Amino acid sequence: MSTTRPSQSSNNSGRSRNSARIIAQTTVDAKLHATFEESGSSFDYSSWVRVSGSVDGDQQPRSNKVTTAYLNHIQRGKQIQPFGCLLALDEKTCKVVAYSENAPEMLTMVSHAVPSVGDHPALGIGTDIRTVFTAPSASALQKALGFAEVSLLNPILVHCKTSGKPFYAIIHRVTGSLIIDFEPVKPYEVPMTAAGALQSYKLAAKAITRLQSLASGSMERLCDTMVQEVFELTGYDRVMAYKFHEDDHGEVIAEIAKPGLEPYLGLHYPATDIPQAARFLFMKNKVRMIVDCNAKHVKVLQDEKLPFDLTLCGSTLRAPHSCHLQYMANMDSIASLVMAVVVNDSDEDGDSADAVLPQKKKRLWGLVVCHNTTPRFVPFPLRYACEFLAQVFAIHVNKEIELEYQILEKNILRTQTLLCDMLMRDAPLGIVSQSPNIMDLVKCDGAALFYRNKLWLLGATPTEYQIREIALWMSEYHTDSTGLSTDSLLDAGFPGALSLSDTVCGMAAVRITSKDIVFWFRSHTAAEIRWGGAKHEPGEQDDGRKMHPRSSFKAFLEVVKARSVPWKDFEMDAIHSLQLILRNASKDTDIIDLNTKAINTRLNDLKIEGMQELEAVTSEMVRLIETATVPILAVDVDGTVNGWNIKIAELTGLPVGEAIGKHLLTLVEDSSTDIVKKMLNLALQGEEEKNVQFEIKTHGDQVEFGPISLIVNACASRDLRENVVGVCFVAQDITAQKTVMDKFTRIEGDYKAIVQNPNQLIPPIFGTDEFGWCCEWNAAMIKLTGWKREEVMDKMLLGEVFGTQMSCCRLKNQEAFVNFGIVLNKAMTGLETEKVAFGFFSRKGKYVECLLSVSKKIDAEGLVTGVFCFLQLASPELQQALHIQRLSEQTALKRLKVLTYMKRQIRNPLAGIVFSSKMLEGTDLETEQKQIVNTSSQCQRQLSKILDDSDLDGIIDGYLDLEMAEFTLHEVLVTSLSQVMNRSNTKGIRIANDVAEHIAKESLYGDSLRLQQVLADFLLISINSTPNGGQVVIASSLTKEQLGKSVHLVNLELSITHGGSGVPEAALNQMFGNNVLESEEGISLHISRKLLKLMNGDVRYLKEAGKSSFILSVELAAAHKLKG
């Protein structure tokens, strides 16, 4: 099927097309920049965008020189903004290799008006930077030179030697040198003395807390909250959330502005408004500030001996380019602050627990943009806080995107339902004449069916004449494809596209036959876009030549008036599925009559119910509770204890008999009553809290030891209708560790006696000082992580010790890093922190999962001097006992098992149906046709039977009713063989049927459908295990045994012999129930063996030199004797 827009059917091809689109868009950006520079004040923005809008993602304009010059200009600009100054140093010598023209004045000039000779040292190429700053400042900069992740130290507070003025030194490394941005510390600021993350968090703490408290499920609410918090945090006149769409154009999706400013909410911008090169820079530098777009830029002078031009891409002072400055001026914006929102690329796989695998690929989802009508400077600590806030925001955006994908999956299931419903109709007319119809399949404005030279129209469509013209055009120019999808008929080359543009411009069309076509139509994108901003007053006009948001919006509308919303991959999958159904139906609707109502019912409403399952779960829960070596208790819906295992009875001194029947709240300490009450109420509502700490009373001889401290996970117990009928609490006894921690946190002097104590009761402990440096790492941490104390001490805890790249203990992803930072910072500010789940990779690559507790460290005066972190590892006993929490999830797991089984089993009969249909097309013999139709019918019956198998446990445990009927082995063989013929033909494997004729024609009595299911399954496994060009041989033997006067018992044995190395050992182990059922083959073989056992049979697998055999045995009855 041809398409004028690349679909993303695979990750690799999707990414390659995405790269091609970015390259093409970068070329367009370069042309725009070059034209702007050449045209000056005569540049007509709207006209240029309309012309460039026709460039598609799969077309690359040949402008390599222009593009190269543009990218070099963007990346190698030699100017900075004047609010600070810049030095570039040689890493080995600390000498200046480049400096901004304002650096000598800012860094060496004394404060009095008339400087005298000797007031300040000379600053230029070759100057040793240590002569410019005070000794402590020079020492700090010297230390940074040898630091691998130098950005973790930002900002470094330095003081000039001559004037004593404080500056923030913001350092980053480029090839061959260190670049340092110096930003003056304003008189009203309290200088930041610690590295960024720890101190900046305090500024954004309120905003982060509010974002984390939001309920999921609304991207709009999330974005509105973000812009509100940034508005309050930074004080800019306008804050917007800006989202990039799939075609790279942007949209303002949230906004807050001071009164009197024109709103931009709802505006869409062409992709060129934020060039690809700028987006790349946003991925590298997450925050970008322009203080005054009217300020004169400062040149950067570099040593002529340098073999390359320095890049200032990573500089916080980098000057904006003229094109962007003009844009800001046209929208009356003098200053701006932009934060990048970077999320996981949806094309990538999920996070891996493997330490050697790379991190997830990222993409720029959008920007948080702040504008001000007057110059505005935001100090680095506040910008760092904004970057931290943007990272938290990005995590929540990621979660909302994942939620949207889940909704998308539900839509796919809905589509399956529609497809199956349409399949039951009078195809193909039922898809337009009944409800639901083809317009319900995918989002569209209209649809049409062109069938046997007649047209049926639905919704907004072209005229009948125009549709016939489209069909004729497709037959002439798209003869080799099965259809066409495009978001622009104009771009696709349809001659009459302009006459259609007011009604439709996007189309998806598929052929049922060479002459019959189904169409879906979409109107242009502009019809769906609404601007939420102020309307024009009468007589007011825009100057479309200027680069302005309103002009951008109009230019965007001009571009998209001939383009619809692109067709999504899942929508095209649904369309293709319907196409296949209709094409098959058009061949012979009487032959292929799939029972899709059963498919729909089973796939979309699959439930595993039954008293046997409930009894199994109940007995398992009772066994686990009674024998677990960790404390476990359970209550009913009223909070009355109905479960109390031996371990908790030992800890509390309260026997099981006395505990049963008491209310849980009477058994816990008064200080824990509210905590337990909340936990219990939430669990009864289905919300299961994890890692909750409370204390429970002791009784009898245990009273003298005090209350027991527990870490508890709640697990709601449910009945078959998913109603909560009680709560089970799985706990870990942490009394000993808590005693140690309490003593630890109460000590006012020397902590080392406890931290460095080798006692096994001491948990893993590490700590940081108030500046973020790792200052504690006890013996338990060494054992747990594999990193020695001297290897981590005096490293930055956030980034060097625990981080996502080049760190000692690698965290799984950026989200884990940000959340770890939040917990540390909360404790540093004196706030109480709860235990949180924490995980990292040890030195050997093992992933460690634990609970993290963080406590502030205080000195004798009560000042916070750092934090201590305690890790609690789940004991093996707790890990074993946590199995009980997964009991409530068994239904979902069994559904997955059933779906895996069904997926496997459905393939065989469907393949048989397809094969039978192909055979029917090539024969005129009435007898053979009847045989093929009969085979197809048997396959369909088998399919229906499999779809009824929702209770796998019933089959495994032998609780399945067999449907007895008369049949011949010949019928079973023919039907089973039809299901594997496609596979055998593909591999060139010959199937030899050595079953004797008298056995094949023997009238038998039993469940023929189950027998053919089993036989087809073992045949397919044998074919898959046979080398290409090999042979599979079927043979049989039959013996009869008389039971009474009228019944003969038939012992049927079938052998399936194949060449090659044989069936994999793992699959055979699963067949015999020796291993967990993991693979499709293993599940299928296991079920087939259980079906044979239901028929008083079994299976053996024999291996000889060069060949192997399945030996199937089954007990049946001789049908002719039963008749008499």
Swiss-Prot record:
Biological process according to GO: detection of visible light; red, far-red light phototransduction; regulation of DNA-templated transcription
Manganese is among the record's keywords: no
Keywords: Chromophore, Photoreceptor protein, Receptor, Repeat, Sensory transduction, Transcription, Transcription regulation
Single annotated GO MF: phosphorelay sensor kinase activity
Domain Histidine kinase as annotated: residue spans: 901-1120
Gene3D superfamilies: 1.10.287.130, 3.30.450.270, 3.30.450.40, Histidine kinase-like ATPase, C-terminal domain (3.30.565.10), PAS domain (3.30.450.20)
PTM annotation: Contains one covalently linked phytochromobilin chromophore.
Function: Regulatory photoreceptor which exists in two forms that are reversibly interconvertible by light: the Pr form that absorbs maximally in the red region of the spectrum and the Pfr form that absorbs maximally in the far-red region. Photoconversion of Pr to Pfr induces an array of morphogenic responses, whereas reconversion of Pfr to Pr cancels the induction of those responses. Pfr controls the expression of a number of nuclear genes including those encoding the small subunit of ribulose-bisphosphate carboxylase, chlorophyll A/B binding protein, protochlorophyllide reductase, rRNA, etc.
Protein name (record): Phytochrome type A
Organism of provenance: Lathyrus sativus (White vetchling)
Gene it is expressed from: PHYA
